[in-house]
Regions:
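Cysteine-centered iron-sulfur cluster-binding motifs in ferredoxin-type domains/subunits
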Residues: 43-64, 79-100, 139-142, 220, ...
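Glycine-rich phosphate-binding "P-loop"
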Residues: 172-198
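A short alpha->loop->secondary-structure connector
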Residues: 231-244
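Non-ligating segments of multi-cofactor redox enzymes
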Residues: 15-42, 83-86, 105-108, 118-121, ...
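Long, compositionally biased charged/polar accessory segments in the mid-to-C-terminal portions
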Residues: 157, 268-508
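Short, charged low-complexity linear segments at domain edges
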Residues: 19-40, 56-81, 190-192, 283-304
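Iron-sulfur cluster-binding cysteine motifs and their immediate structural context
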Residues: 28-32, 52, 56-80, 90-111, ...
Length: 510
């Protein structure tokens, strides 16, 4: 079907077709909550805060119908709807949209919250790009850049679909897909792009070439490609590897404007702009003006203080609700290994510890296809890898575990507002994150405790549905867990009520 894969809300507990998170919660209880629904149009994906700007809708519909643009006031990448789509085309685009449906790799079922958090693993290794220049200049120890270069050099693919990371967002030529046919072109796109970009707006162009290719993009972009494969067989035929990062979110482009203003650099004066790289993590961001002036922030300051006086970093609502941040649908995911679980300021790193910051990553192969790619890159000497364990994901990226444990209750707080649906596998992992007491305890140990509320259980009882087995099971959790879930419910609801999930839909008339 080309129509939108709606979440199912009223299947019996033993139904294999269950797809909504509430159905797959503790004890797989039936939870008929029909006022929870996914967006039913591309426009509603945008208006309800579920869009993340991947560009697949423009790719499917064509630029005469939809164009991805950077739009004020936050300077986010969003579709501009120019003409009405035919029903079949709209259905196809909506079926692919990661703002409408989050999917999973089939045939794998986690048994614990930790397994669900790490995701499907064929192998997990720790290492870096063997080439010193790639390791230094690319982000995250050059892992993804190396894999992309290797796929072309080994002739496993003819080209790679990715983006040019080191670019200022006002450069329109870098706002969409970059198709690289040589390893040098892949290297030219190196570095993280911590801002809105539409890596899939040229996916149809890639498919039309009828040549094997790979995709390097964010987890939500990979989600879109997997969704699209269900309605277009060319994707599985031609796309030989889907590679991604561990994604914490990306900043609105208005944060770049704040950074430039703070350092008294105009857009027109920029000669070079880098989000990351030249160290791990390196300056974040870095700008060189045409007159030779250089400005840079420390990674910690930009992400957590957005340049201190510049104000808080802002990002889109879709990222706050993400349940795919570790690339659970990818063939290969590459993620930073932060020593002690946090990036540190450069001036806090002693000479004795400098080797820890040369750039290390965890590389997880999730599929046999991904395993073959990683193995061949290692055999070719392009990656230097050693053994690692799944628990290192939580130890080096605890912030992602905190996102996981709170995802279920944040989804529940949405009430009647449209929210991207979860397929059965995605729903199961979200339920495992919330309901596995051992996992929640490990997660809570990585951050500050939730505020103590004397009547937390009573408050949560008023919020949850009556008579549902999963809700009763949640209320029987330890008090510290109840306080944790209640705190996340209230925080999400507060943000919803102030309009964080509401956006304006742009048309040709705007």
């Amino acid at each position: 079907s080309l129509g939108h894969p709606q979440a199912i809300h009223s299947s019996p507990p033993d139904s294999p077709a269950m797809t909504d998170i509430e159905d797959l919660a503790c004890l797989a209880a039936k939870f008929d909550r029909s006022n929870t629904r996914a967006p039913t149009s591309l426009q509603e994906v945008v208006s309800s805060g579920n869009c993340m700007g991947c560009g697949i809708c423009e790719s499917i519909a064509g630029p005469e119908y939809i164009q991805m643009k950077v739009l004020p006031p936050k300077q986010r990448m969003r579709p501009v709807f120019l003409k009405a789509l035919e029903a079949e085309v709209h259905g196809k685009a909506l079926a692919a949209c990661p703002g409408a449906q989050v999917s999973s790799l089939p045939g794998w079922t986690p048994t614990t919250g930790m397994e669900a958090f790490v995701g499907k693993v064929m192998s997990i290794q720790r290492g870096y790009a063997s080439d010193p220049e790639t390791r230094f200049k690319a982000a995250a120890a050059g892992g993804l850049t190396t894999l992309g270069m290797h796929l072309i050099e080994s002739k496993q693919v003819d080209f790679v679909v990715h983006v040019k990371a080191c670019a200022l967002y006002s450069d329109e030529s870098t706002q969409g897909s970059k198709l690289s046919f040589t390893s040098a072109e892949v290297f030219d796109g190196r570095g993280s792009r911590y801002g809105p970009v539409a890596p899939l707006k040229s996916l149809e162009d890639a498919l039309s070439l009828k040549r094997p290719f790979a995709v390097v993009a964010k987890p939500c972009d990979i989600n879109a490609v997997r969704n699209y494969a269900k309605v277009d067989p060319r994707v599985d035929e031609l796309c030989k590897c889907l590679m991604t990062v561990s994604c914490g979110t990306y900043a609105d482009n208005v944060c770049v404007d704040k950074f430039l203003k703070q350092h008294e650099v105009e857009h027109s004066e920029v000669e070079e702009f880098r989000w990351r790289g030249h160290g791990c993590p390196g300056d974040t961001p870095y700008v060189k003006a045409k007159d030779g002036r250089v400005a840079a922030d420390d990674y910690v300051d930009f992400w957590f203080y957005n340049g201190k006086e510049a104000g808080p970093l802002t990002y889109q609502w879709r990222c706050k609700m993400c349940s795919d941040f570790l690339g659970y649908q990818s063939d290969v995911v590459v993620m930073d290994c932060w020593p002690n679980g946090l990036p540190e300021r450069r001036n806090a790193i002693t000479e004795e510890r400098k080797h820890e910051w040369d750039g290390w990553v965890l590389i997880i192969a999730r599929t046999q296809r991904g395993q073959d790619v990683v193995d061949s890159a290692k055999a070719a000497g392009m990656l230097t890898l050693g053994p690692a364990e799944g628990r290192e994901v939580l130890q080096t990226q605890p912030h992602q575990a905190r996102r996981a444990a709170s995802n279920f209750i944040r989804r529940y707080s949405h009430a009647s507002r449209p929210l991207m649906a979860l397929d059965e596998g995605a729903a199961l992992r979200v339920a495992k994150w919330a309901m596995d007491e051992d996992f929640v305890d490990e997660v809570m140990a990585t951050g500050p405790a939730a505020p103590v509320v004397a009547d937390a259980a009573e408050q949560l009882r008023e919020i949850l549905p009556k008579g549902e087995a999963w809700a009763e099971a949640m209320l029987k959790m330890p008090e510290r867990h109840i306080a944790y879930h209640l705190d996340n419910f209230k925080g999400t609801l507060k943000r919803l009520e102030r309009g964080d999930a509401t956006e304006t839909v742009s048309t040709s008339a705007d």
